């Protein structure tokens, strides 16, 4: 199962807010979201399966990890996994200024998601 939402991209005005290693950028691919606190449903297996889907679709992917020293968001993916035991991955398209009046996302990432979704549903 895919839990599809958006993902925090590295904001050029607030680069220090992003994880120093996992830094999603706009128009650089679909983001696979991980959380050591299980705020996302992604595990090693589901991430590997989704990476293979991206490779088959010919689209790039990136990773996002919540910083360990700062609270972060979550999705409904981890909540639903408590009710239904299926393999699932939390993904999103990177955007700037999530939950603000002016969110910004990359149009190429939308095309990447459409291609990956087509492979997933085949």
Residues covered by each model-derived region:
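A glycine-rich helix N-cap at a beta->alpha junction
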Residues: 1-2
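Short, glycine/acidic-enriched loop or turn micro-motifs at the edges of active sites
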Residues: 8
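Active-site-adjacent substrate-binding region
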Residues: 11-14, 18-105
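Short secondary-structure subsegments characteristic of cysteine-rich extracellular domains
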Residues: 106-115
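Structured mid-domain segments that build the active-site/substrate or prosthetic-cofactor binding neighborhood
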Residues: 118
């Amino acid at each position: 199962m895919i839990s599809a939402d958006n993902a925090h991209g590295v904001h050029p005005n607030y680069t220090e807010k992003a994880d120093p290693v996992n830094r999603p950028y706009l128009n650089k691919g679909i983001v696979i979201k991980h959380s050591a606190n299980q705020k996302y449903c992604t595990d090693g297996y589901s991430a590997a399966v989704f990476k293979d889907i991206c490779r088959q679709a010919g689209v790039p992917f990136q990773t996002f990890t919540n910083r360990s020293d700062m609270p972060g968001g979550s999705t409904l993916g981890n909540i639903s996994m408590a009710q239904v035991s299926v393999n699932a991955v939390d993904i999103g398209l990177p955007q700037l200024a999530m939950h603000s009046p002016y969110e910004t996302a990359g149009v190429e990432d939308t095309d990447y998601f459409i291609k990956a979704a087509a492979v997933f549903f085949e």
